[in-house]
Each structure stands twice: as C-alpha cells, then as structure tokens.
Amino acid sequence: MIVDSSVIIAIFLGEPDAPDLSLRLRRAPVRRMSTASLFEAGIVLDQRVGLEPNEPADELYALLQRAGIELVPFTEDHAQIARVAYRRYGKGRHPAGLNFGDCMSYALAKSLDEPLLFKGTDFSRTDIRVA
C-alpha cells in the first residue's frame, strides 16, 4: 500500500480520523511512501507546527519508522507518471483536482500497481486503486 502525505499529516496532528488511518496502516502488509511525499508532509507540518529552520524533523521520521513505512525514491519514471496524472486529473482540469503532491503519491501507486491510502475524496475520482 502507498501512503499519501495527508495520512501522515493527519496522524501526526492527531486529527479526528487519525485512529482509523493508523489502524488501516497497521493492517497493510506493505507500507510505502514516496520521498517526494515525505518532503510535502514535512513542509505542511513545519507550517502547522511552527518548527524553526534549524529544528530537526526527528518526530516525523520517528512516526514513519513506528508505522513501518518504507521510503521510495522519486524517479524519472515517477515524474512522467505524475505529469500524465496532472494532465488527466489536475486542479482546474478534472473534478479530482489533484495538486502537485497528490500527483507524487499517484505516480508511486500507479508505478507499483498498489492501492493508495489517503485522506479526502480526490483520489477516488481517479483510476487509482483505493486502500
């Protein structure tokens, strides 16, 4: 299963759906996340939590480790898939309205033919398998 940044953000911030998302993560035999999605999650959490530029992101990495999430490098092939995803499902082009970060998760899920765990409804309007 591929994990979108929205899931990590929700769990990290203790949002109302965090327990359900955590359970779904634990039940998956394989959990992967793109390094591009990790970067996105880090940016969002830095903004919401208010980390200073020199503060380490240890808590985010600890969460990934506890959840058993394998980080997968974002490749040129992923970039090509993400570009096609944006053309098909991007904001202003399609009701799914995928943004830059969404396309990164989409690309990894598509390239590995794995379902995607995410928060919200955007991906359910695409051809991606839902976890």
Please state what every model-predicted region is:
Residues A28-R32, A67-V72:
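Short loop->beta-strand "edge-of-pocket" segments that line small-molecule binding or catalytic clefts
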